[in-house]
Amino acid sequence: MSIMLKKWNELAEVKAELAARDWFFATSGNLSLKVTDAPLTFLVTASGKDKRKQTSEDFLLIDADGKPVEDTHLKPSAETLLHVEVYRRTNAGCVLHVHTVDNNIISDVYAQNREAVFSGQEIIKAFGIWEENAEVRIPIIDNYADIPTLANEFAKHIDGDTGAVLIQNHGITVWGRDAFEAKKHLEAWEFLFSWQVKRLLLQRAAVPLVD
């Protein structure tokens, strides 16, 4: 099996798993998986596709400038430049971006803080943090309509081979050294977002909570 086909199948599997969670509302979201380092190439989801379906045109191969390697009628996802920034600056192998109701709520509620902070949850161990009552933070950036501007702002928060950024009312982007790690971190963040949204609702309803 060629490296290209292997990577295609791997990304298709991730897409299917996230689609099963219904995380691709109205064709939103984008995914990518690095294929080669030198030169940099990666597979990225094609723009405007229903990601709940599996087709032969789900992905296209992209270069270090965010351009298709071969002539194609397909267009790469709108936020492909964000993926480029991650691959240029780190050794990450996979980037995942999804819009969910919970991550949009969290990005809106904590927008003025420029970050959301979570602590005391067992799921934080998914990030490799094992301290008791550990804390994790995720930056929140403004949602710029101009993608190069958005990519420049996003790039300020890329500081390792794994990471995550919330874009206000525009979903979460997570990256990891491989698809398994990126998906694991995405699932952990979404768990924390869902937990916090429900916690805020209970607090508003004046339901006693145990800290």
From Swiss-Prot:
One function term, GO molecular function aspect: zinc ion binding
Cofactor: Zn(2+)
Cofactor note: Binds 1 zinc ion per subunit.
Pathway(s) the chain acts in: Amino-acid biosynthesis; L-methionine biosynthesis via salvage pathway; L-methionine from S-methyl-5-thio-alpha-D-ribose 1-phosphate: step 2/6
Keyword hit for Phosphoprotein: no
InterPro entries given in the database record: Aldolase_II/adducin_N, Aldolase_II/adducin_N_sf, MethylthioRu-1-P_deHdtase_MtnB
Source taxon at top rank: Bacteria
GO CC list: cytoplasm
NCBIfam families cross-referenced by the UniProt entry: PRK06754.1, salvage_mtnB
Protein name: Methylthioribulose-1-phosphate dehydratase
Organism encoding this protein: Geobacillus thermodenitrificans (strain NG80-2)
